[in-house]
């Protein structure tokens, strides 16, 4: 019943209007479809996303080559396989590519088939994806890290920090956390509009006003939390995705921050100061992916007080994560399916993080689709945290709505992660 009968692929459009890959896998009694996302700020160690490069078509960003690779190589490779054996299926996909970074056939092609096969398997056994992947233990609804103010490469507004997020960890349930986030989002819109700021949104649904400094952005976020009737640090925390690899000069070992050149020591000192002035509970990619000295310094200074997330540092790669754990860099990992390219490797990375005492945050990409796989993955793995944008743009809201559906399905059996992921040894806890 779970034998794969067909694999088809097509080119579809993502939330930025760029092509991406969608695959559909059919077994004797089930079907699964999946579309892969794409990032704007990408780590240099990520699995390779294959683009056509034909400037006459989608400005070179077409994915017909990746689609063809599914139709002629990857699809035939898994025909007749048992969709219920995800590990073996992903092994075959990886072997078909044969390169260390999935550059031959494309991580976007491989992941589309991997995700679609998982969905087909779940459909075959008549289970929701989150239950199929997570089993009976899947019951934790994640605390959302909601990106309400954008900067960096996600917005042309002069801010280096890429995401200013709110973390409604004081809520009693996921539904209440989502409501809290939506209220703060709309309140921020009102504050910005009142001050004559632009209220257009960036790639991930957050506002992208032109502000004088990163600190000014944080001040707006805290004002919005308070104006919405919530207590900063008690009901709602703040998280940052600095994505500072985009603003690092490896030759001079200097960062651009607030339009000034800074050393790694100065950058870490800035974070230390901001963490004292604002209720910051998480900092992602606070220094560049290849700045090991910076990561050591940041972890030594703030690792016992704040969640330090490696995104570009680890790129959802078990080998890079293992080295990071051994070296004591960061204390959490961002999980992006398309950084590594298969469901199995993603699950392995989450398991490895847990064994090493690192938290996992399931994440979207700036170029998204209506696909809700990451919502199911967050619950399946009891990760406890999810990053999937603001309370706007249907490509972001789709994930939140799927989490609401899962919440209703779990009923009294669900647990909301709340503050738990952010409690660290040495950190001051909210009363």
UniProtKB/Swiss-Prot annotation:
GO terms for biological process: glycolytic process. The active site is at residues 204, 336. It is found in: Cytoplasm; Secreted; Cell surface. CDD domains: enolase. Its EC number is 4.2.1.11. Mg(2+) binds at residues 241, 284, 311. Keywords: Cytoplasm, Glycolysis, Lyase, Magnesium, Metal-binding, Secreted. It comes from the Bacteria. NCBIfam families: eno. Catalyzes the reversible conversion of 2-phosphoglycerate (2-PG) into phosphoenolpyruvate (PEP). It is essential for the degradation of carbohydrates via glycolysis. Belongs to the enolase family. This is Enolase. It comes from Sorangium cellulosum (strain So ce56).
